[in-house]
Amino acid sequence: MTENRRIKKVNSLLREAIANVILKDVKHPKISNRWITVTRVCLSKDLHSARVYVSIMPHENTSTETLEALKASARYIAYKASKGVVLKYFPEINFYLEDIFSPQDHIENLLWKIREQDKN
């Protein structure tokens, strides 16, 4: 139980530290002019690797380019974030795109169809 609580706490600290580094320190042109939100961090049980999930706005065609730029900058981001989170071993971070808007869009489309059917 305490191990689970510890991982949750470290996940939260990492999410905040990585988000701050992306916002303030990364100067990559495909990253700095995008609205990037670190939605969650999933740390491995041995604390040596972390999956960092991000949502990127504008989302249409630029999200894959921005994700690739984040992956290319992962070591720098980890280095800067390690200054704010003190751990014996700072985890290797891997970025993944979290598409949080697709379920919303799907529900909105369903509601739109229902409204159209009610009118007819």
From Swiss-Prot:
<dbReference type="Pfam" id="PF02033">
    <property type="entry name" value="RBFA"/>
</dbReference>
<comment type="function">
    <text>One of several proteins that assist in the late maturation steps of the functional core of the 30S ribosomal subunit. Associates with free 30S ribosomal subunits (but not with 30S subunits that are part of 70S ribosomes or polysomes). Required for efficient processing of 16S rRNA. May interact with the 5'-terminal helix region of 16S rRNA.</text>
</comment>
<comment type="subunit">
    <text>Monomer. Binds 30S ribosomal subunits, but not 50S ribosomal subunits or 70S ribosomes.</text>
</comment>
<keyword id="KW-0690">Ribosome biogenesis</keyword>
<dbReference type="GO" id="GO:0005829">
    <property type="term" value="C:cytosol"/>
</dbReference>
<keyword id="KW-0963">Cytoplasm</keyword>
<dbReference type="InterPro" id="IPR015946">
    <property type="entry name" value="KH_dom-like_a/b"/>
</dbReference>
<dbReference type="GO" id="GO:0030490">
    <property type="term" value="P:maturation of SSU-rRNA"/>
</dbReference>
<dbReference type="InterPro" id="IPR023799">
    <property type="entry name" value="RbfA_dom_sf"/>
</dbReference>
<dbReference type="GO" id="GO:0043024">
    <property type="term" value="F:ribosomal small subunit binding"/>
</dbReference>
<dbReference type="InterPro" id="IPR000238">
    <property type="entry name" value="RbfA"/>
</dbReference>
<comment type="similarity">
    <text>Belongs to the RbfA family.</text>
</comment>
<protein>
    <recommendedName>
        <fullName>Ribosome-binding factor A</fullName>
    </recommendedName>
</protein>
